[in-house]
Structures are given as structure tokens and as C-alpha cells.
């Protein structure tokens, strides 16, 4: 099974558990760091995410994973909040943070810049528009390697 298929399968099974505990399943990733594998589950809530909330979700998801055993190799399960400088993975995330400052990291330079920071104005399937100072800058989505919320306290 491909990593993408694994993640999609896990999402379908984990999402109802997370929602049943009054959290949103923000993102799932399965990564190898050094010799270790990690299944990372990011949860969110309008009221924030507490350590106790992460523990509840971790226990519930761990039970499911023990039952269905979807991953053949050993791994560590981590459950956390996406954090203040969260990566915006989906259109749903972009929609939620319209009007907020974001950082766009690019695969290749546009006007000699590989990083743009500004207010998320709008987006569609092909591009993201941000306001930089008083100008609207349009960045093709295919050029974007990572979109991050600019955390502000």
C-alpha cells in the first residue's frame, strides 16, 4: 500500500474517533526520521488543544490501531496540536485563515524571492493571492512548497 493510500485509509478510520472527542482531525502524516517511523496526528479545536485532549485522542486512536494493525513496521504514535505556525495543507485550512498573515515558501524564485509573506486575500485551484504591503501578489500553487500561518501572539 502506498503512503498516500495508507494516510487516506487511516483518515477515514481515525476522523470519527477524533470528532467523537470534540476535535477536528487537522492532518495525518507518516514519516521516517533517522531509523524511526512516526505516525503523527494533528488535532484542532475552536477552544484550543490541551495535553489532556491529546492524551485522550492518543489512547482512543491507539486502541483502533491495535485492532486494525494497518502499519506493518514499528512506529511511534504522536498526537499534537498543529501549533501557532501551522502548515496550511488544504483548501479548508486556507478558507479558515483568509485575512490572516501567511508565509509561502517556493520551490523556485519569483522576482528573485523564494519566500513571500502577506495577508491571505484569496485562492483558487491554481493560485494564491496575498497582500504584501499595499500590493496583491499572485503566486501559482505549483510553485509553492509550503504554506504556513504566520503565528502572532
UniProtKB/Swiss-Prot annotation:
Keyword Cytoplasm on entry: yes
Domain of life: Bacteria
Signal peptide residue numbers: none
Localisation per UniProt entry: Cytoplasm
SUPFAM superfamilies: YhbC-like, C-terminal domain, YhbC-like, N-terminal domain
Record InterPro entries: Ribosome_maturation_RimP (IPR003728), RimP_C (IPR028998), RimP_C_sf (IPR036847), RimP_N (IPR028989), RimP_N_sf (IPR035956)
Gene Ontology CC, one term: cytosol
Alphabetical UniProt keywords: Cytoplasm, Ribosome biogenesis
Main location: cytoplasm
Single Gene Ontology BP annotation: ribosomal small subunit assembly
Family: Belongs to the RimP family.
Cited function: Required for maturation of 30S ribosomal subunits.
NCBIfam families in alphabetical order: PRK00092.3-1
The name this protein goes by in its record: Ribosome maturation factor RimP
Species whose genome carries this gene: Clostridium botulinum (strain 657 / Type Ba4)
Gene from which this protein is expressed: rimP
Amino acid at each position: 500500500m502506498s503512503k498516500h493510500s495508507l494516510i487516506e485509509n487511516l483518515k477515514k478510520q481515525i476522523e470519527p474517533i477524533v470528532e467523537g472527542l470534540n476535535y477536528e482531525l487537522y492532518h495525518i502524516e507518516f514519516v521516517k526520521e533517522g531509523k524511526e517511523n512516526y505516525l503523527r496526528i494533528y488535532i484542532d479545536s475552536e477552544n484550543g488543544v490541551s495535553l489532556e485532549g491529546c492524551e485522550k485522542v492518543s489512547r482512543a486512536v491507539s486502541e483502533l490501531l491495535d485492532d486494525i494493525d494497518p502499519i506493518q513496521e514499528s512506529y511511534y504514535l504522536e498526537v499534537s496540536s498543529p501549533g501557532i505556525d501551522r502548515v496550511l495543507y488544504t483548501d479548508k485550512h486556507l478558507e479558515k485563515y483568509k485575512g490572516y498573515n501567511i508565509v509561502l515558501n517556493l520551490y523556485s524564485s519569483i522576482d528573485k524571492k523564494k519566500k513571500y509573506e502577506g495577508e491571505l486575500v484569496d485562492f483558487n485551484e491554481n493560485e494564491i493571492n496575498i497582500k504584501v504591503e499595499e500590493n496583491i501578489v499572485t503566486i501559482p500553487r505549483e510553485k509553492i512548497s509550503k504554506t504556513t500561518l504566520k503565528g502572532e501572539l
